[in-house]
Amino acid sequence: MPDPRFFQTLSPLTVAALAEHIGGEVVRGGEVIVSAVAPLSSADRGAIAFLGDRKFAAALAETKAGCVIVPPSAVDAAPADAAVIVSSEAQAAWARASALLHRPVRLDRAITAAQAAEDDTVVVEPGVVLGEGVRIGRGSRIGANTVIGPGVQIGRDCLISSGVTVGFALLGDRVKLLAGARIGEAGFGAAGSKTGPVDIPQLGRVILQDGVTVGANSCIDRGAYDDTVIGENTKIDNLVMIGHNCVIGRNNLMAAHTGISGSVTSGDNCIFGGRAGVGDHITIGEGARVAAGGGVLADIPPGEIWSGYPAKPLRQFLRETVWLSKQASQKKGAKESKE
């Protein structure tokens, strides 16, 4: 169930009513009532889940979901005790269901600094807007014209600079957010459909653990359902993008213009050079390094240094670069001798 501090759960619907709204066909269990969406792996009897890819067939067989949305080819694989909706656009149908069952808590009214602060050591500069349920730990400072969305929890001795927005997030102690940082915006998720891409509601959170620094104008998206987590003492430079569902380890360093796609996991003590890019669902091992400009399309084992595009182990990259340079020089020399 999405965190109620950040998401409102709307009225439950029967499977039949839901199918009518999302463009699916009920196979069985139209009278079943569902009140939430969830992934196959964590869904309970009150939730609706979907199968978007055959590689998750095992999760479908084991799910506890009260209802599942499946493509026509997977109807027979659905659990016998679950209601079933069939759709050729299962993920898009699930996205539509999510919008019918959950809604982000909006900043309809603000509270005062005194209501949010743990004590009088908290400093809130002019122009700050604080949503309902915000809590700010002692010794923290919120910069001018920053907006803190409903339910956000900020730890002690934090420094949030001017023009920052924070929503759907939990911040530990000693967190620093520099000017213009964007924490907790919706992740980039869209499901294909015959009528065009459908936005997938992002129902997770951002968790910034103790000692995290986020540079100016950097963005960290909230999770699609699970959380985006930045580990203790990780330092993020200006203009860095971290996608939804990422789990970044402790003591990571990310130089400017690094881009981390969704669902990336990094171990502790990893380093990313400037303009490094990491593809989605990649695992970066503990202590690994990505050189500046590297484009990572495969998992990196612990302790290795990778470079280039597509990124590969540094020594291999250097050998190949030298070989290519020699080949180019030989061809150039042969061409000049003919002339």
Where are these regions (language model features)?
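Terminal amphipathic alpha-helical/low-complexity segments used for targeting or macromolecular assembly
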Residues: 1-115, 174, 180-181, 186-198, ...
